[in-house]
Amino acid sequence: METIIEEYLKFIQIEKGLSENTIGAYRRDLKKYQLYMQEQKIAHIDFIDRQTIQECLGSLIDQGASAKSIARFISTIRSFHQFALREKYAAKDPTVLIETPKYEKKLPDVLDVEEVIQLLETPDLTKNNGYRDRTILELLYATGMRVTELIQIEIDDVNLIMGFVKVFGKGNKERIIPLGDTVIEYLDTYINNVRSQLLKKTVTNVLFLNLHGRPLTRQGIWKLIKQYGLRANINKTLTPHTLRHSFATHLLENGADLRAVQEMLGHSDISTTQLYTHVSKTQIRQMYNQFHPRA
């Protein structure tokens, strides 16, 4: 089964263009699956049946796996077995009758407009890394892009004259996101004045660099967002996705079209975008309860 797993991982990396993080998650799930089957002395993929899979899922639940984790695990092994059947590594797909559990999607943490401004104004613009950080925060809030998309942006992906940035999302899908006047100003100064001072002797087209002239990492962005959140005294859990959540929620609160927001966020399924309308409804309910005399 190990050989089939490796072939499957190669397939989804090449054919689907998934990120290393996503591939890593698939690999971990499949290694758990393989280990369980080894413990059950199952030597061949065709010996796996529905009951064995259900027992495997039961084992994960006993270990404390959440409904969301179980749903992802089922999705992974279902895709794996479909691949094995299609490529004739297996004669059947035992996941056909396995149901995916429903789980409640957690509403994301969102900053209000005042908190966003507090966060954006925290970096020290007199320092190169401070100006870079302000540009990063402005860009994340102005576009709603993922941090994994931001760290891949190259100089040529930014068109300041036309006012857009090109990013490559999940599955390496390209999309164009418009830029507002404020973020264009920050990008202009960063690209033409600040970046060259960070670049040093490094040769790279990547837009955002660290103090050593190397491309910033996802972990580096995570760290700076957490640090600025603490300095801004924001008492909410800040993650690299917080500004993305805030971008979507603020647009929808101000009447933006759901489909347009879906396009900018790069969501393949509009139900994911609709989650942000639930955030807005929650805030409306809180406001009603606070201010209506008969609430």
Curated annotation (Swiss-Prot):
Keywords carried by this UniProt record: Cell cycle, Cell division, Chromosome partition, Cytoplasm, DNA integration, DNA recombination, DNA-binding
Active site: R146, K170, H241, R244, H267, Y276
Gene Ontology terms describing biological process: cell division; chromosome segregation; DNA transposition
Annotated ranges, domain Tyr recombinase: 106-289
SUPFAM superfamilies assigned: DNA breaking-rejoining enzymes
GO molecular function term, any single one: tyrosine-based site-specific recombinase activity
Compartments (UniProt record): Cytoplasm
Domain Core-binding (CB), residue spans: 1-85
One cellular component term from this protein's GO annotations in UniProt: cytoplasm
Transmembrane segments annotated in the record for this chain: none
InterPro entries assigned: CB (IPR044068), DNA_brk_join_enz (IPR011010), Integrase-like_cat_sf (IPR013762), Integrase_catalytic (IPR002104), Integrase_recombinase_N (IPR010998), Integrase_SAM-like_N (IPR004107), Recomb_XerD (IPR011932), Tyrosine_recombinase_XerC/XerD (IPR023009)
Family the entry assigns: Belongs to the 'phage' integrase family. XerD subfamily.
Assembly notes: Forms a cyclic heterotetrameric complex composed of two molecules of XerC and two molecules of XerD.
Function according to Swiss-Prot or TrEMBL: Site-specific tyrosine recombinase, which acts by catalyzing the cutting and rejoining of the recombining DNA molecules. The XerC-XerD complex is essential to convert dimers of the bacterial chromosome into monomers to permit their segregation at cell division. It also contributes to the segregational stability of plasmids.
Name of this protein: Tyrosine recombinase XerD
UniProt source species: Staphylococcus haemolyticus (strain JCSC1435)
Lineage: Bacteria, Bacillati, Bacillota, Bacilli, Bacillales
